[in-house]
From Swiss-Prot:
Coiled-coil spans in chain: none
Enzyme class: hydrolase
Gene3D superfamilies assigned: Leucine Aminopeptidase, subunit E, domain 1, Zn peptidases
GO terms for cellular component: cytoplasm
Protein location: Cytoplasm
Primary localisation category: cytoplasm
Binding site for Mn(2+) 2: K248, D253, D271, E332
Binding site for Mn(2+) 1: D253, D330, E332
Organism: Solibacter usitatus (strain Ellin6076)
Pfam families (alphabetical): Peptidase_M17, Peptidase_M17_N
Protein name in the entry: Probable cytosol aminopeptidase
EC number: 3.4.11.1, 3.4.11.10
Keywords for this protein: Aminopeptidase, Cytoplasm, Hydrolase, Manganese, Metal-binding, Protease
Named cofactor requirement(s): Mn(2+)
Amino acid sequence: MQITIERKPLGQIEADALIVPVFEGRRDARFGAEDLFASGEVAGKALEMTLLHHAPGVRATRVLLVGAGAAGKFDAAGMRRLSGAAVRFLKAKSVKKIALVLDSEFSGSNFASAAVEGALLGNFEPDRYKTGNEKKSLDTFIVAGDTPELESAVARGRILAEAQNFSRDLVNEPANLLTPLGMADAARKMAAEFGLECEVLDRDAMQKLGMGSLLGVAIGSAEPPVLIVLRYRPAKSEGAAHLGLVGKGVTFDTGGISIKPADGMEKMKYDMAGGAAMIGAMRAIAQLKPAIPVSAYIPAVENMPGSRAQRPGDIVTAMNGKTIEVINTDAEGRLILADALTYARRQGCTHLVDAATLTGAVVVALGHLNVGLFANDDAMRDRVLAAAKDEGERMWSLPLEDDYKEYLKSGFADIANVGGRWGGAITAAIFLKEFAEETPWVHLDIAGTAWLDENKPYLAKGPTGLPVRTLARLAMDWKA
């Protein structure tokens, strides 16, 4: 989809449709819709859609009045949803060229960025492998406004949304096509296009490094495991900080010997959403060029049953020397992240963020609206929460108290990989804390937010691409 800017009066914009936000309690005297406002048919409620044809005073053939809700509560996140919902509404009607009107009260650059993000995210469909002619997509999205920073804001919004959609495309790939090696190949191609360094560690390299925790997960699969490393190095680094991003890359998760139920297992191609988010974030970071170095580490494996697969009761030795009793082979994400976190620390990362579709327990706790956030450092937690708030990606801080480590006691090894029924999201984070050690670290459990089971007004069902925007913002806003 082409994104353009027009600094013209409203009546001179040529498009198939104009998108005009409307607040609750306000009447817009333009477009000949006074009767609709007076009758209450147009009330301005959030995401309410009213389509006008051949409205007076404009060249566009349609005007879409979109409810923005209460004016005092409308923010960039609201603009992102409004733009995405309007795009999805209009493209269903085969509209090809639309313009979103940013009046003076939307003059802030954050609104322009959010409008572009919403449009690109809303235009995305998980239909790559459909062969019919029924696909509908917009050709052109015009941002109509007059703020001085419009060009840079639109460019930033496009970078972030395209990176997020890149991540969504990766998650949508079926596991027979996106194997661990396939994921590495996608990362290599992206790195070459955007000027990042890319290194891929194979099984032999990981064995030499002592990554027994990661490799234990992979031994049941015919697909070889890899550790994907992406590096961004600024021309001039400010301060000593080096941000490390670690993402779970289980390209298909059967549960292993502790096998999952068949119902819904097809969705387990999305168990690499954390890794895909890190690849997407690095794509955005390469273009936005923050002042600090950023490296991403994506352990990519399949978790399969078989005659060679890891068994419940097995003991593996992680890269940092800790021994782990594998009670449940379906708690594999923490096992691969453990060695990736250790490797990131030894590579010089001073601050760490990991993202993983790690536990069903976080969905029980928070539903599908908030990412579960855990941190061993208050300042690091606050950085991530601030970035998430700015980008409209909802997160909620959960406890990480040492007392929960009691749940992970093993009679045979230093630690068990699961801690029983209660507090499962917390005990998973406590497990990872053993490998982050003293490095300031945030763990994001995205199991409830990485995937939509049905369409939203502003987003197609399937992968969401969270938390790509938060991670890019974190890097861009970093202050020593």
